[in-house]
Amino acid sequence: MAHTLLVAGTASHVGKSTVAAGLCRYLADCGVSVAPFKAQNMSNNARATPGGEVGVSQYVQARAAGVAPSTDHNPVLLKPRGDGESQLILDGDAVGHFEARGYYDEHWEDALETARAAHDRLAQSHDVIVAEGAGSIAEINLHDRDLANIETARFADADILLVADIERGGVFASLVGTLELVPDDIRKQVAGAVITKFRGDQSLLDPGIDAFEDRTGVPVLGVLPHDDPGLPEEDSVALPPVGERSVVGDDDAVPDAESVTVAVPRLPRISNFTDLQPLAHEPGVRVAYIPPDAALDDADAVVLPGSKNTVDDLRALTDAGFGDRLRSFDGPVVGLCGGYQMLGEAITNATIEGTGDADRVEGLGLLPVTTEFSESKTVEHVQRNIDGVGPLSGASGTVEGYEIHMGDSTLTGAAARPFDGDGAGTDTVLGTYLHDLFSNDTARDAFVRNTFESAGTVLPAATGRADGDPYERAAGLITDHVDLGPLGLSDQ
């Protein structure tokens, strides 16, 4: 039977996904048969596998482990769409939309059995399972139905590695409080703790570590420096709240002759914003998440991201006057998935996804496209030839990505089809259903080059990502800073 290690956290966004990915790559490099697992994930950043949708972190962890991503790695996925409802995905298939109470009353037992069965299948074919918890393992109001943490620890008989983030302050209070609040049987399964996002002289931290270990008997197995390996973010906790602006990427300097700003409206129900991360790693490129009512005066390009509720997010943009400002904008504009649908003339059957009563919702009107929603959902990995137009002018060859969407879009006027029949493009505007577009060098390089040319700025001499393989960087954080001996992983 496989050895399961549960990477649990004291809170959300403490680094669980990075630690899990690093462990997966480290073990794979050691020749260990390893697989990731997250019993239940709540995220709108999903990826397509042959069996259906999984959370992006488990997709990434599977790649780090050297195994094909599968719905067994994330058997239960909840995708929030707003107004307290989430779409439930079991074993990759969409079941329906539920409020929390409806999910627990109607589908909790199904979800538990689905997760157990997925873990059992993985345990039969791998030596180690690196399971990731969700949020905090100490949510005492949820301990009777905490699938990703408490239930996983129990049905997998997992050792637990507790992860805490020092950047937010109070790291020892978080660790001690978590250990005080978890059930007694779970407390006994905690094999060690890891502190993440540390800056400075670690010797100043050592007295606190000694006091924590004396008080709890739990060893601190490592202190990870504040070093982002560049893995995709799991959920919108990593983004600014709606209404606030935040910049990622080359943001150390004010805009100058060798930099451009790509503006991304921070949609209330944004999804798959990992599509933008490759741009943020380009020299001279800043990705600015802006409120829907923000001006576009300092933007050199605009990318409309995906949305879990395209109709309601379109209404939010329209109500904020974003459409008027976008139609007056003369730089490159790209819409991805839901963003592509918003750029069209209209969306019909809108009540299937939106929360309003209107069957037809007017789009932003930048592309001659109408979208009709239906109950069916497209989930697939795709490979397409690209004939770059507009913002992607100059791109050619083959691109890979994935589609996860409801609705089909139809051309209503003159526009190019840049991807083997998918998408629509004009001189300055392009839309596509293809997620992960900018992970393809030909598409990303063309977009960056065209954005610099449109802005009249100088393209930096250095192009492309220069910070190394993110999987190996994550593994390096583990091997360089964590004592794995007490976890028993070397015995596999």
Curated annotation (Swiss-Prot):
The keyword Ion transport does not apply. This is Probable cobyric acid synthase. It comes from Haloarcula marismortui (strain ATCC 43049 / DSM 3752 / JCM 8966 / VKM B-1809). GO terms for biological process: cobalamin biosynthetic process. Pathway: Cofactor biosynthesis; adenosylcobalamin biosynthesis. The active site is at C337 (nucleophile), H435. Coiled coil: none annotated. Catalyzes amidations at positions B, D, E, and G on adenosylcobyrinic A,C-diamide. NH(2) groups are provided by glutamine, and one molecule of ATP is hydrogenolyzed for each amidation. Belongs to the CobB/CobQ family. CobQ subfamily. GO terms for molecular function: ABC-type vitamin B12 transporter activity; catalytic activity. Residues 259-443 form the GATase cobBQ-type domain. It comes from the Archaea. Keywords: Cobalamin biosynthesis, Glutamine amidotransferase.
